[in-house]
Amino acid sequence: MIYLKFALLIWLLLYNTIVNANCVSCNFDNKNLANFEFKNQNLSNASFQGAYLVNADFSGAKLTSAIFDDAYANGASFVGAQLDNASFRNAELELANFQNASLKGVTFESAYMVHAELSKRQILESKFCDNAVKDAMKFSSMCKNQ
């Protein structure tokens, strides 16, 4: 199984996409994955800690309990992704798009989220209001009215 995950990582680095891959618990820590496509893939429990994910596309991906701590994911798309219990501590998420994503129990502690796309429902179902989120003024009124 370890060799399969290593081969998948080599494929990723060469072709910037995952096609019908199952990469549960894969480790992408500190990797440059800018512009990669992870659409509709099962990446549950995967770790992207410190990864460079600018404009990466996670649309429709299963990212339950994934770790994005300290990741740089400006412009990343998480449209329709399942991110329940994921962590974005200290992540840069400027212009990240979370439309229709499931964010139950997601942590955004000290995340930078200027111009990120989040709905009121997503803010209330995540731990957003409990976390100190940097530059999230446009969301603050939603937390006050819980």
Predicted regions, residues:
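Sec-dependent signal peptide recognition
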Residues: I2-W11
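Tandem repeat scaffolds
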Residues: T17-Q146
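Hydrophobic membrane-targeting alpha-helices
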Residues: L12-N16
